[in-house]
Curated annotation (Swiss-Prot):
Cellular component terms per the entry's GO annotation: cytosolic large ribosomal subunit
PANTHER family to which the protein is assigned, alphabetical: 39S RIBOSOMAL PROTEIN L12, LARGE RIBOSOMAL SUBUNIT PROTEIN BL12M
Gene: rplL
Alphabetical UniProt keywords: Ribonucleoprotein, Ribosomal protein
Biological function: Forms part of the ribosomal stalk which helps the ribosome interact with GTP-bound translation factors. Is thus essential for accurate translation.
GO molecular function: mRNA binding; structural constituent of ribosome
UniProt family annotation: Belongs to the bacterial ribosomal protein bL12 family.
Keyword Hydrolase: no
UniProt entry tagged with the keyword Membrane: no
The protein's name: Large ribosomal subunit protein bL12
Disulfide-bonded cysteines: none
Subunit architecture: Homodimer. Part of the ribosomal stalk of the 50S ribosomal subunit. Forms a multimeric L10(L12)X complex, where L10 forms an elongated spine to which 2 to 4 L12 dimers bind in a sequential fashion. Binds GTP-bound translation factors.
Species the sequence originates in: Brevibacillus brevis (strain 47 / JCM 6285 / NBRC 100599)
Record-linked InterPro entries: Ribosomal_bL12 (IPR000206), Ribosomal_bL12_C (IPR013823), Ribosomal_bL12_C/ClpS-like (IPR014719), Ribosomal_bL12_oligo (IPR008932), Ribosomal_bL12_oligo_N_sf (IPR036235)
Length: 120
């Protein structure tokens, strides 16, 4: 199978199928799909610059956890168990390195479902 054929097969997969594929690759090769996090020590002048990347944190699942779990699954592509664990163990980071517009959209969707969310 060529690289192009593999890419075409991946393009035709749903989010759930892709999630299963990633898990299978992690298990087969003993790797993780987690993105490396770079830690940068910033100076005072850099802190004054406008922030361009934001982190969306789930503070609490609220009273309507089922709706929040559904939205978390939709936004992250996680499976039911993973989304439930994330909501049950809040506060947790939901997404990192997103634009301000995307962060606000995520926050609005989650708050509409009943979650408490903070954007940093």
């Amino acid at each position: 199978m060529s690289k192009d054929q593999i890419l075409e097969a991946i393009k035709g997969m749903s989010v759930l199928e892709l999630n299963d594929l990633v898990k299978a690759i992690e298990e087969e090769f003993g790797v993780t799909a987690a993105a490396p996090v770079a830690v940068v020590a910033g100076g005072g002048a850099e802190a004054a610059a406008e922030q361009t990347e934001f982190t969306v944190n789930l503070v609490s699942g609220g009273a309507s956890k089922i709706n929040v779990i559904k939205v978390v699954r939709e936004l992250t592509g996680l499976g039911l168990k993973e989304a439930k664990d994330l909501v049950d163990n809040a506060p947790k980071t939901l997404k990192e390195g997103v634009s301000k517009d995307e962060a606000e959209a995520l926050k609005a969707k989650l708050e509409e479902a009943g979650a408490q969310v903070e954007v940093k």
